[in-house]
């Protein structure tokens, strides 16, 4: 569901990560690719998003492109309207980090706090499933940045 909806919303690349609270280590990249292609066909898209191999949280964070901010969806962050946060920022391409069931660990939060490219955002007072959080974050970003395909 997550890759389908995110593909429909214009995501260009998926970086599946294993964090300390990830429930399964057996994510089938091939199965996800099939879902991505189905979503592209369904919505009439003109590009197929890339999906990288499963990687660790630390490795993705350490190797994230320097020219992009990371929107870190943090359910422990005191609620602040996401649009207010996004409107204060001036940047182009972003990566959005969505946590697993159980959220990001304290250790992972500490890693994020040390990274100057990370912007912590709240998706509201509710604890959302990863799929819902992804759609919510992408929709909020899309309302700030306009159409990603420009």
For the regions a language model picked out, list residue spans one by one.
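Glycine- and other small-residue-rich loops at beta-strand/loop junctions that grip anionic moieties
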Residues: 25, 49, 101, 126, ...
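Structured adenosyl-cofactor binding patch, chiefly the S-adenosyl-L-methionine
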Residues: 106-150
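Beta-strand/loop-alpha-helix module characteristic of Rossmann-like adenine-cofactor folds
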Residues: 9, 74-76, 150
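Active-site/ligand-binding-proximal alpha/beta "capping" segment
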Residues: 70-111, 117-122
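A short acidic, often aromatic-flanked loop/helix-cap motif at beta-alpha or helix-coil junctions
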Residues: 55-61, 78-80, 127-128
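RNA substrate-binding interface of SAM-dependent RNA methyltransferases
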Residues: 1-72
């Amino acid at each position: 569901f997550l890759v389908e909806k995110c593909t429909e919303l214009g995501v260009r690349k998926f970086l599946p990560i294993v964090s300390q609270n990830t429930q399964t280590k057996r994510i089938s990249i091939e199965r996800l690719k099939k879902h991505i292609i189905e979503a592209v066909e369904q919505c009439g898209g003109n590009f197929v998003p890339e999906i990288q191999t499963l990687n660790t949280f630390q490795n993705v964070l350490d190797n994230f492109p320097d020219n992009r901010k990371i929107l870190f969806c943090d359910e422990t962050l005191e609620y602040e309207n996401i649009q207010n946060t996004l409107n204060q920022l001036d940047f182009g391409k972003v990566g959005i980090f969505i946590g697993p069931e159980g959220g990001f660990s304290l250790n992972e939060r500490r890693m994020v706090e040390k990274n100057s490219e990370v912007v912590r955002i709240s998706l509201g007072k509710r604890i959302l499933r990863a799929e819902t959080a992804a759609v919510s974050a992408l929709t909020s970003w899309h309302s700030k940045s306009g159409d990603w395909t420009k």
